[in-house]
């Protein structure tokens, strides 16, 4: 009887191992496919000349007309196209080529102006466990990291926008973030609020802020946590 139970236990262990190995392979395959997809998109559409980067938006648009921009933060691995879907679910699990993908695509909130002229331009991306997509946003909450990587570049079909990070923190997911402010006072109050919430201490000059750029990804410190990185034009 003991021998039979031993063999049953052994078979169960083997089955659990095989299922776990299969799942791990599935995760690895999914991560690799997504990484390869975006590396190819970058290779085909980002050109570097004398240190300057240019994005071929005509070529990108021919592949996917939902393209609205490209986000790049030197030294972080953040270097991706930005799309805007019909809602905020469309690109959660669909890559730039409109194929199913756990990594999804970096996307602009569907309520924002696609030309990035909203008062608060909100950009979402997954926090992938292999460090891709917006995973590195969490590093902006570290003061030592932020000192070296405080600039985020946003390329659009019409211009290049240089951004400076003014706040970075993690809190429970906010169901609604303001996209439009009723007046300048409301906008200033919001800026004061997000700066108080910032984990690293960031100096900010007194010049007028026209608009905010908010980058959002999942955090895993607590259930339903998000990391928010806010930036303004330099």
Where are these regions (language model features)?
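N-terminal Sec-pathway targeting helices
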Residues: 1-13
